[in-house]
Design a protein with these regions (language model features):
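Beta-barrel outer-membrane channel/assembly domains of diderm bacteria
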Residues: 1-71, 98-128, 144-149, 173-177
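Solvent-exposed loop/turn segments connecting transmembrane beta-strands
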Residues: 6-10, 104-108, 131-140, 161-167
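Disordered, low-complexity tails and leader-like regions
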Residues: 18, 69, 81, 89-90
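A mature extracytoplasmic/lumenal domain signature
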Residues: 32-34, 65, 75-79, 87-88
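Outer-membrane beta-barrel pore domains and translocons
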Residues: 33-35, 76-78, 103, 127-131, ...
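Gram-negative outer-membrane beta-barrel proteins
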Residues: 36-42, 79-83, 132-136, 161-165
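Short, flexible helix-coil linker/hinge segments at the edges of structured domains or between repeats
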Residues: 86-97
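Detector for outer-membrane/organellar transmembrane beta-barrel domains
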Residues: 120-121, 137-139, 144-180
Length: 180
């Protein structure tokens, strides 16, 4: 009889992304996901926790209000959707640990937000999101972010305020020239 508590886990994720634009400056995003990490003890959101059946995990519409501002609205989105800041030079989802009790965690629920986005300059975002299928006093998250994005460096300050926890995060990155 083995008393070892070690184990090997293999997880996978299937993802289908559909992007549609009506005006060229907007984006209707639908993402279908499935995977086998539903009961994984790893507790990471990097693999799908949607179960074996293909389901819609993201459904949102992002559009420009004018030259400086954009808005986002949708019935299913992660906390990082619609935030204008750039926390890393690489994969934003991994860098901000979305899906745990961190700065952009709100689960997969409805949300609405507004952002001032600049590819080279100051950014700001305000978003109201939910970790449930509806927005109410128990499930509401207020996610705010300010950031600076330049060609070789940047960062963000992000807050997530709700009834269960308040999270505050600071992220910076430097990407030297001639570095992948």
């Amino acid at each position: 009889e083995s008393t070892s508590s070690e184990s090997l886990h293999f997880t996978y994720e299937n993802k289908i992304r559909l992007n549609t634009s009506f005006k060229g400056t907007d984006n209707l995003l639908t993402v279908f996901e499935s995977g086998n990490a539903l009961d994984s003890p790893l507790m990471l959101d990097l693999q799908s926790k949607k179960g074996d059946n293909l389901k819609i995990s993201t459904l949102l519409y992002k559009f420009q209000l004018n030259d400086e501002y954009e808005a986002i609205i949708g019935p299913k989105m992660f906390g990082y959707h619609g935030l204008a800041g750039k926390s890393t030079a690489y994969n934003e989802r991994i860098a901000i640990l979305d899906g745990s009790n961190y700065t952009t965690s709100s689960g997969i629920g409805p949300g609405i937000g507004i952002s001032k986005r600049k590819k080279n300059g100051l950014n700001a975002s305000f978003k109201i999101a939910s970790d449930s299928s509806q927005i109410d006093n128990e499930s509401i998250h207020f996610i705010n972010q300010i950031g600076l994005t330049k060609k070789n460096f940047g960062g963000t300050i992000t807050t997530n305020l709700n009834n269960d926890f308040d999270a505050y995060g600071i992220a910076t990155f430097i990407k030297p020239k001639n570095f992948p």
